Amino acid sequence: MAARLCCHLDSARDVLLLRPFGPQSSGPSFPRPAAGSAASSASSPSPSDDSDLPLGRLPACFASGSGPCCLVFTCADLRTMDSTVNFVSWHANRQLGMPSKDLWTPYIKDQLLTKWEEGSIDPRLSIFLLGGCRHKCMRLL
């Protein structure tokens, strides 16, 4: 069975937070540095409630030397699972209209917060199903 993980990038600490999606599991926990992070294990942030990750349901590829294969993303809207696309290509295409790639994250956050405050958030913003191999299935919230 594929592991279901919920991921969130904490840019303030440069940490990718992964949490099991579904039934809770027990086991040791540790923070996972974000992809592309130059931080070494000695300079990684100290564990906290926000960055703990139960290991009981993680896929075998998670601890591989080259990193988890969940970093090779495909994505699809849950309502149109027939047409999956490569997440990296989709993300790059969405950025083409932006004057700077640095503006991408603030732009999306601003759009999400505005829609949330207006009470008109589109459910499609939270139903991308991400995956990259047979080891796991991730949902981006």
UniProtKB/Swiss-Prot annotation:
InterPro entries: Transactivation_prot_X. It comes from the Viruses. Residues 68-113 are annotated as: Mitochondrial targeting sequence. Signal peptide: none annotated. Coiled coil: none annotated. Multifunctional protein that plays a role in silencing host antiviral defenses and promoting viral transcription. Does not seem to be essential for HBV infection. May be directly involved in development of cirrhosis and liver cancer (hepatocellular carcinoma). Most of cytosolic activities involve modulation of cytosolic calcium. The effect on apoptosis is controversial depending on the cell types in which the studies have been conducted. May induce apoptosis by localizing in mitochondria and causing loss of mitochondrial membrane potential. Residues 25-52 are annotated as: Disordered. Keywords: Activation of host NF-kappa-B by virus, Activator, Apoptosis, Host cytoplasm, Host G2/M cell cycle arrest by virus, Host mitochondrion, Host nucleus, Host-virus interaction, Modulation of host cell cycle by virus, Transcription, Transcription regulation. The gene is X. One of its GO terms (cellular component) is host cell mitochondrion. It holds the Pfam family X. It is found in: Host cytoplasm; Host nucleus; Host mitochondrion. This is Protein X. A fraction may be phosphorylated in insect cells and HepG2 cells, a human hepatoblastoma cell line. Phosphorylated in vitro by host protein kinase C or mitogen-activated protein kinase. N-acetylated in insect cells. One of its GO terms (biological process) is symbiont-mediated arrest of host cell cycle during G2/M transition. May form homodimer. May interact with host CEBPA, CFLAR, CREB1, DDB1, E4F1, HBXIP, HSPD1/HSP60, NFKBIA, POLR2E and SMAD4. Interacts with host SMC5-SMC6 complex and induces its degradation. Interacts with host TRPC4AP; leading to prevent ubiquitination of TRPC4AP. Interacts with host PLSCR1; this interaction promotes ubiquitination and degradation of HBx and impairs HBx-mediated cell proliferation. Belongs to the orthohepadnavirus protein X family.
